[in-house]
Amino acid sequence: MKHAELFLEALDRRARLFAPSARATFEANRELCSWLLNPLARWAEATYGETAIDDAARGYAKYCFGVAQAQQIYERAGRYTPESMPEIMSGVYKDEDYAVPYMWAAILIYAFWPSMVNHIKMFRDEFLRQLPRNATVLELAAGHGVLSLLAAEERRDIQIEGVDISPPAVAIANRLLAVSGHGDRVKFAIQDALKTNEPASERQYQGIISAMLAEHLPDPKPLFMAITQRLSPEGLVFFSTAIESAQRDHVFEYNQESQPLRMAEAAGPRVSRLVSDASTVLAGSRFLPRATAMILRRR
């Protein structure tokens, strides 16, 4: 059995309600999804043992139920109703029991959600494969670290630094890194992605990854300013965010694709490419949850 299919079989066992749609997305994008899932399965089993794939499937199911519940609350309230930032920090980002299943789901959705699969295609084909040779790359809010590890797997010439505010997330990233074979080129650290007033933050990078971070911030504008400050003249940015897609820790509500686009361009970079795909919604819904990704370049 191929490594990618281990996840699909685990969903059949542990996340039956969500398995058919995940399999349909995988089958429609087999090569691309396998590019993500094959190394992920190897790293997961090498790190966490033979139960890792089933644990990931359970985490995915828990995440999907949570998203559905949050979207129902959003429909009733007419706006995001997140917890306070201190509650999010303690109950999500610093709570290992919550963060570990959350982190598994946060990477599996790229292969199993129709609204996310084009993100991983853009990430690979229009970001990673277009970076300058020997590029240095910074990932903001790296979480599980898998995007950085996939970058290292795809581009053996690049160096990557990943930062995240969540200690459990960075612990996961470092454990996966230890078995990935990329320890000489990838580093993860606990750090606020928006801390730009420190000497190390003056360094510029040829590649910056900011995947699904903006919606977690009270105000995303400083994020775009930080990206602009750190991007080298020849650099590329992979940026993504959620639109009308409520979750427990989604704080900033985007309603239109033009909103993050305008924020990016107001900070300086040019948007050279944008994709946005919607999730399936119930008839009569007020909101259409979407996932939007952009490639940014220096002007």
Language-model features: locations:
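N-terminal auxiliary segments of SAM/dcSAM-dependent transferases
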Residues: 4-92
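Conserved alpha-helix/loop element of class I SAM-dependent methyltransferases that forms part
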Residues: 101, 114-133
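Conserved SAM-binding loop of SAM-dependent methyltransferases across substrates and taxa
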Residues: 144-156
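Conserved SAM/SAH-binding beta-strand->alpha-helix loop
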Residues: 166-168
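Conserved SAM-binding strand-loop segment of SAM-dependent methyltransferases
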Residues: 182-194
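A short acidic, Gly/Pro-enriched loop at the edge of an enzyme's catalytic core
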Residues: 194, 198-208
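A short glycine-rich, Lys/Arg-flanked "PGG" loop and its adjoining helix->strand segment in the class I
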Residues: 222-233
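Conserved beta-strand signature within the Rossmann-like core of class I S-adenosyl-L-methionine
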Residues: 235-242
